[in-house]
Amino acid sequence: MEDSMDMDMSPLRPQNYLFGCELKADKDYHFKVDNDENEHQLSLRTVSLGAGAKDELHIVEAEAMNYEGSPIKVTLATLKMSVQPTVSLGGFEITPPVVLRLKCGSGPVHISGQHLVAVEEDAESEDEDEEDVKLLGMSGKRSAPGGGNKVPQKKVKLDEDDDEDDEDDEDDEDDDDDDFDEEETEEKVPVKKSVRDTPAKNAQKSNQNGKDLKPSTPRSKGQESFKKQEKTPKTPKGPSSVEDIKAKMQASIEKGGSLPKVEAKFINYVKNCFRMTDQEAIQDLWQWRKSL
């Protein structure tokens, strides 16, 4: 009894096979199943007239068993070449045995669908699948700690690369300001150390010689570079020419920008943005602005 119960409760795995047949006036189709161990279903999809069918009425009929086990006949489709050459049944399922026939018309009529078979799965294959799933789960848990550490490292590396790129861009834009700040910090550090270390020595020398001696501080690289900067100051950029300013304003307008419409605001705009101080050139630019 227990073995029979186990066989009844075993899961079923469906398999699908293509089905098709041709009906004519003198040609029926009998769908039978010799293997009774598995469940079979015939799922009909479409019924259509074949090439060469006459423009006449075709009636397709199916004969099978009803719930009580008695034979029953059902009309599946009514076709005519000029009106309705094909009909979709949308999955009309019938349990075999089934007889498909052409009740009216000469044909040919083609019927297509699927043959569904429910196959029992082996218990051994299920056990093997479960063992494979368990092994995969164990390997995934073991590899989880190592895999979790790799992601943050990659993120940190990416963040460091992004920070380095940003710092490189800022260094390229503000190179002069950074050099000046570094030189000031380098200049302050040795001065403090020398002031702390040399007061006693300077006091002794001043007492011996009777003269006030200035504390000797070693020259730092920052002082030398700072003096070089004082000797060679950068030449300020001069004002742009009138034609260059017009070209830049025109480009700004083409990009969607706007210029001041009031003369006083326009003059301030030219002086601040283009460092233009020539009044004649400013008036020339204002006349050009009004002509736009």
From Swiss-Prot:
The modification N6-succinyllysine is found at K265. A motif (Nuclear localization signal) lies at residues 152-157, 190-196. The modification N-acetylmethionine is found at M1. The modification ADP-ribosylserine is found at S206. It is found in: Nucleus, Nucleolus; Nucleus, Nucleoplasm; Cytoplasm, Cytoskeleton, Microtubule organizing center, Centrosome. Residues 241-292 are annotated as: Required for nucleolar localization. The modification Phosphoserine is found at S4, S10, S43, S70, S125, S139, S225, S240, S241, S252, S258. InterPro entries: NPM1_C, Nucleoplasmin, Nucleoplasmin_core_dom, Nucleoplasmin_core_dom_sf. Residues 138-248 are annotated as: Disordered. Its main location: nucleus. GO terms for biological process: cardiac muscle hypertrophy; cell volume homeostasis; cellular response to hypoxia; cellular response to testosterone stimulus; cellular response to UV; cellular senescence; centrosome cycle; chromatin remodeling. There is a cross-link at K228, K261 (Glycyl lysine isopeptide (Lys-Gly) (interchain with G-Cter in SUMO)). The keyword Signal does not apply. The modification N6-acetyllysine is found at K32, K150, K154, K211, K227, K228, K248, K255, K265, K271, K290. Residues 159-186 have a biased composition (Acidic residues). Keywords: Acetylation, ADP-ribosylation, Chaperone, Cytoplasm, Cytoskeleton, Disulfide bond, DNA-binding, Isopeptide bond, Nucleus, Phosphoprotein, RNA-binding, Ubl conjugation. The modification Phosphothreonine is found at T75, T95, T198, T217, T232, T235, T277. Residues 201-210 have a biased composition (Polar residues). Belongs to the nucleoplasmin family. This is Nucleophosmin. The lineage of its organism: Eukaryota, Metazoa, Chordata, Craniata, Vertebrata. The gene is Npm1.
